[in-house]
Regions:
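Acidic interaction surfaces
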Residues: 1-146
Length: 146
């Protein structure tokens, strides 16, 4: 247990013996959409993968109709034609283009997981600020709010 006192306040930090996710019992501001092969992270969702999630968010922003789908396909084709440096570079560019449009309607931050003798999540990468982070961390999803 840790205690910090700064009159008139006192802060006490102690281990939580109740192993219930606060996201299940408390109200929360954002929705966490995560993808991980071993852990159930974030809020429940039905997206197959991050591409499915980003496409749905994009279409929710521009419209779930034929015009929205054409705009999505046109954006993917334009971005793909500009990047010939490998599939990962192209995929990253498409993701960034979609997120730029999504940001017109949603505030969305990346979620990173640090998996080393326990789990920690952050909206900033752990690389450079945690030991072994270059091997034990990576982006697992997003948290968003409209």
């Amino acid at each position: 247990m840790l205690i910090a006192v700064n009159e008139p306040y006192a802060l006490m930090v102690q281990p939580d013996d109740i192993l219930i996710s606060p996201r299940e019992v408390d109200e929360h501001f954002g929705t966490m959409v995560c993808f991980h092969p071993r852990y159930a992270l974030g809020d429940h969702h039905n997206y197959m993968d991050k591409d499915d999630f980003l496409r749905e968010m994009y279409l929710d922003t521009v419209g779930h109709d034929e015009a929205g789908m054409k705009r999505y396909e046109r954006m993917v084709n334009i971005v793909s034609s500009r990047f010939r440096h490998g599939p990962k570079t192209e995929e990253r560019a498409i993701d960034e283009a979609m997120q730029k449009v999504i940001s017109e309607k949603y505030l969305m931050l990346p979620l990173y997981l640090y998996d080393h003798s326990g789990l920690a999540m952050s909206t900033e990468s752990f690389s450079g600020r945690a030991s072994h982070a270059e091997w034990d961390c990576g982006q697992v999803g997003w948290i968003y709010v409209s």
